[in-house]
């Protein structure tokens, strides 16, 4: 019964007040005198009671709207146009998304930032505070709004199935995505921003100049507050990260090419959103001056979605949620920016520790055979493409790694070399500590699930290095 709510609306109250007297008078001189008050009572209940946020008429309207559009393809955004501010080199791509003009800011992850999971909550200093974003909008462009969009995955399906299953068991329900990127989409509604845009130029040209200048200023202010933000010259990376392979909208899910993507409302925040098992996760938090933030979550799974605790599907509005037209009221959050990374150990209090490797090139010095085995297994499950030397062929076949002249893990935007490599930062992993350019020595305890032992036995007897 938690889905049932009472919701008062002035418009509905006026309609009931207007129609109630005729209903009562209609049956007054019949033997069904009770029918008039009964109809009024039913109308009052229908006007007050909502189910999952909609009244009965709202559900009927949503159903017929879904019938009309369910087989239509998605409307593609317009081709991006790059506009420049008065400062040469500050280029910002803008495009139309429906009736709204949008620009993109990419938030750059802070390298070598560990994430510690304490009682199901992720602790990291690589975050963007939605309160700060609302403050910047209020000061510099109060008639604009911004969406903080994160996309990524907890584990990847590119490695051997046994390796992925083993890593999923090791991380459990930790809100620790192996890969995640974050953008801010600045949105300009021509109706709301008409006055500010008109000061710069007439029509669309003024709106473009206003959006470009505002986006540049927000990125600069975020950087001054310790959040590395870069204006996007294109939407290519964002589009690739948020593509779900849309084919057809169903009532409570979206059919993709080889998967199902479901839009949910889940007010629990990023710790809840990123703990849900899924092949791909997209989160969106909308921030606007003077109003509470709004959010929605999209989870992609290979099979039809099942009921999730704490998540409510957006019934009859999956396409609208995908296109950022349906969001639910939320609260301010500190949103993680980059990847949590790979599980490297735990603290003395047995809290898991994760370290990202997918944001900057590194040379990884692995302490012994067990650490080497664990890192290769977990990096493969996290989405890295592992390459090992020829004498590691039995181990590579077991893991699903490639054979090549140089041992490394290739991530989408970085490479981790398993050994010395000139010109890149060095990370040292031992069973009892982690050393990075940012942290000299972080003491840790090893996490060794039972299933990892059989992989270590496949290592060659001579030599314990990766090359």
Model features per residue range: what roles?
Residues 1-79, 427-467:
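N-terminal alpha-helical membrane-insertion module
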Residues 3, 112-116, 362:
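Short small-residue beta-strand/loop micro-motif enriched in glycine and branched aliphatics
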Residues 46-141, 339, 343:
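N-terminal topogenic membrane-targeting module
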Residues 111, 152-154, 188-192:
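Short loop/turn segments at secondary-structure transitions that flank enzyme active sites
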Residues 131, 135-144, 379-382, 465-466:
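A short, charged
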Residues 141-183:
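Structural flexibility/helix-modulation signal
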Residues 168-467:
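Membrane-proximal, solvent-exposed terminal domains/tails of membrane-associated proteins
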């Amino acid at each position: 019964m938690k889905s049932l709510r009472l919701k008062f609306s002035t418009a509905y109250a006026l309609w009931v007040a207007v129609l109630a007297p005729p209903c009562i008078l209609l049956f007054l001189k019949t033997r069904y005198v009770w029918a008039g008050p009964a109809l009024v009572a039913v109308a009052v209940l229908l006007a007050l009671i909502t189910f999952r946020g909609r009244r009965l008429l709202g559900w009927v309207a949503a159903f017929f709207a879904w019938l009309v559009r369910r087989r239509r393809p998605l409307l593609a955004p317009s081709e991006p146009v790059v506009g420049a501010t008065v400062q040469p080199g500050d280029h910002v791509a803008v495009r139309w998304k429906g009736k709204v003009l949008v620009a993109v800011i990419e938030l750059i992850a802070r390298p070598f930032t560990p994430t510690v999971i304490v009682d199901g909550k992720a602790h990291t200093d690589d975050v963007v505070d939605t309160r700060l974003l609302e403050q910047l909008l209020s000061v510099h462009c109060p008639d604009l709004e911004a969406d903080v969009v994160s996309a990524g995955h907890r584990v990847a399906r590119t490695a051997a199935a046994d390796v992925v299953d083993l890593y999923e068991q090791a991380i459990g329900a930790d809100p620790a995505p192996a890969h995640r990127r974050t953008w801010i989409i600045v949105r300009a509604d021509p109706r709301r921003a008409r006055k500010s845009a008109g000061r710069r130029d007439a029509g669309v040209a003024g709106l473009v100049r206003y959006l470009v200048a505002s986006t540049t200023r927000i990125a600069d202010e975020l950087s001054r507050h310790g959040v590395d933000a870069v204006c996007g010259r294109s939407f290519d990376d964002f589009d690739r990260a948020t593509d779900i392979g849309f084919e057809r909208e169903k009532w409570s899910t979206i059919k993709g090419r080889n998967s199902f993507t479901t839009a949910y409302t889940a007010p629990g925040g990023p710790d809840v959103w990123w703990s849900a098992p899924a092949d791909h996760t997209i989160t969106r938090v909308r921030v606007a001056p003077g109003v509470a933030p709004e959010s929605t979550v999209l989870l992609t799974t290979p099979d039809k979605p099942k009921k999730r605790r704490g998540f409510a599907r957006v019934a009859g509005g999956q396409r609208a949620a995908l296109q950022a037209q349906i969001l639910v009221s939320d609260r301010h959050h500190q949103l993680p920016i980059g990847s949590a990374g790979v599980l490297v150990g735990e603290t003395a209090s047995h809290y898991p520790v994760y370290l990202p490797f997918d944001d900057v090139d590194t040379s990884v010095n692995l302490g012994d055979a067990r650490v080497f085995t664990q890192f290769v297994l977990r990096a493969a499950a996290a989405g890295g493409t592992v390459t090992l030397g020829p004498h590691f062929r039995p181990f590579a076949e077991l893991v699903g790694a490639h054979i090549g002249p140089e041992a490394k893990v290739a991530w989408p935007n970085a490479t981790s070399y398993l050994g010395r490599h000139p010109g890149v930062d060095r990370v040292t992993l031992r069973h009892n500590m982690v050393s990075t350019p940012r942290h000299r020595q972080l003491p840790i305890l090893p996490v060794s699930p039972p299933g990892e032992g059989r992989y270590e036995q496949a290592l060659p007897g001579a030599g314990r290095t990766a090359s």
